[in-house]
């Protein structure tokens, strides 16, 4: 009995060792998603907001053409990946059931070289995300819904 329990624990611990990097990678991709697209309490939502946020998030060398920031709470965004606040959309994507407050920053001018200047578009939109292991890892698009 003790031998069987010891073997079980050994196999269990080896399994944890194999899955931990995968879980850590998923968490890393989720944190990257939040870094690029999440701002709980935006200050303003105008062109200056976009210039500042894009610079702060490291998207200005070279200048990124477009980026959308989602405003709200993380739990609601994560819920898109489940049935609580999301529905299947296309292949391997999920669309939010409820609209989110968002700010989309579009690069003004054509040069990808700094200084980068952005035009802000604020609104409420349903968002489409790719999920891995119940976490959003990619913002595919945002859709205005009447």
UniProtKB/Swiss-Prot annotation:
Residues 1-24 form the signal peptide. It comes from the Eukaryota. GO terms for molecular function: actin binding; copper ion binding; DNA binding; endonuclease activity; heparin binding; protein homodimerization activity; RNA nuclease activity; signaling receptor binding. CDD domains: RNase_A_canonical (cd06265). A motif (Nucleolar localization signal) lies at residues 55-59. Its main location: secreted. The modification Pyrrolidone carboxylic acid is found at residue 25. GO terms for biological process: actin filament polymerization; angiogenesis; antibacterial humoral response; antimicrobial humoral immune response mediated by antimicrobial peptide; defense response to Gram-positive bacterium; hematopoietic stem cell proliferation; innate immune response; negative regulation of apoptotic process. InterPro entries: RNaseA, RNaseA-like_dom_sf, RNaseA_AS, RNaseA_domain. Keywords: Angiogenesis, Cytoplasm, Developmental protein, Differentiation, Disulfide bond, DNA-binding, Endonuclease, Hydrolase, Nuclease, Nucleus, Protein synthesis inhibitor, Pyrrolidone carboxylic acid, Secreted, Signal, Stress response. GO terms for cellular component: angiogenin-PRI complex; basement membrane; cytoplasm; cytoplasmic stress granule; endocytic vesicle; extracellular space; growth cone; neuronal cell body. It is an enzyme of class 3 (hydrolase). TRNA binds at residues 45, 105, 127. The active site is at residues 37, 138. Disulfide bonds join 50-105, 63-116, 81-131. Has weak tRNA ribonuclease activity by itself due to partial autoinhibition by its C-terminus, which folds into a short alpha-helix that partially occludes the substrate-binding site. In absence of stress, the ribonuclease activity is inhibited by RNH1 in the cytoplasm. In response to stress, dissociates from RNH1 in the cytoplasm and associates with cytoplasmic ribosomes with vacant A-sites: ribosomes directly activate the tRNA ribonuclease activity of ANG by refolding the C-terminal alpha-helix. In response to stress, the angiogenic activity of ANG is inhibited by RNH1 in the nucleus. It is found in: Secreted; Nucleus; Nucleus, Nucleolus; Cytoplasm, Stress granule. Its EC number is 3.1.27.-. Secreted ribonuclease that can either promote or restrict cell proliferation of target cells, depending on the context. Endocytosed in target cells via its receptor PLXNB2 and translocates to the cytoplasm or nucleus. Under stress conditions, localizes to the cytoplasm and promotes the assembly of stress granules (SGs): specifically cleaves a subset of tRNAs within anticodon loops to produce tRNA-derived stress-induced fragments (tiRNAs), resulting in translation repression and inhibition of cell proliferation. tiRNas also prevent formation of apoptosome, thereby promoting cell survival. Belongs to the pancreatic ribonuclease family. PANTHER family: ANGIOGENIN, RIBONUCLEASE. Homodimer. Interacts with RNH1; inhibiting ANG ribonuclease activity. Interacts with PCNA. This is Angiogenin. It comes from Miopithecus talapoin. The lineage of its organism: Eukaryota, Metazoa, Chordata, Craniata, Vertebrata.
């Amino acid at each position: 009995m003790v031998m069987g329990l010891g073997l079980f624990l050994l196999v269990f611990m080896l399994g944890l060792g194999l899955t931990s990097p995968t879980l850590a990678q998923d968490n890393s991709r989720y944190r990257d998603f939040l870094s690029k697209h999440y701002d709980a309490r935006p200050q303003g939502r105008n062109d200056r907001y976009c210039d500042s946020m894009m610079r702060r998030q490291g998207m200005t060398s070279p200048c990124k053409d477009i980026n959308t920031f989602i405003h709200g709470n993380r739990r609601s965004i994560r819920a898109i990946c489940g049935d609580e606040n999301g529905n299947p959309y296309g292949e391997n994507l999920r669309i939010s059931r409820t609209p989110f407050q968002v700010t989309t920053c579009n690069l003004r001018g054509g040069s990808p070289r700094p200084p980068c200047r952005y035009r802000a578009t604020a609104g409420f939109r349903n968002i489409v995300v790719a999920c891995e292991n119940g976490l959003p890892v990619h913002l595919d698009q945002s859709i205005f819904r009447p």
